[in-house]
A protein has these predicted regions:
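Short, Lys/Arg-enriched N-terminal segment that forms or immediately precedes the first helix
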Residues: 1-5
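Intrinsic disorder
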Residues: 6-9, 41
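Short, amphipathic alpha-helical "recognition" segments used to contact nucleic acids or chromatin
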Residues: 8-30
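Secondary-structure boundary motif
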Residues: 21-25, 38, 56
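Short alpha-helical "recognition helix" segments of helix-turn-helix
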Residues: 32-39
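Major-groove recognition helix of helix-turn-helix-like DNA-binding domains
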Residues: 42-59
């Protein structure tokens, strides 16, 4: 893996960590996505999974 790919991978991990932190702090999924600048490329399946997990966890 070249240096550019490592940098992109590191950045994506940071954005994902921020995204998950927003969700854990109670921010709705799509608001959390917007708060991260829509930078992290999430598939619809991933969003559905996160929404389901959030619903199970409750408020």
């Amino acid at each position: 893996m070249n240096r550019r790919n490592k940098t992109i991978e590191y950045r994506n991990r940071q954005i994902y960590a921020e995204y998950i932190a927003h969700i854990r702090n109670g921010l709705p999924v799509m608001d959390a996505y917007a708060a991260c600048g829509n930078s992290y490329d999430l598939s619809e399946e991933s969003i559905r999974k996160i929404v389901a997990e959030q619903a199970r966890a409750g408020p």
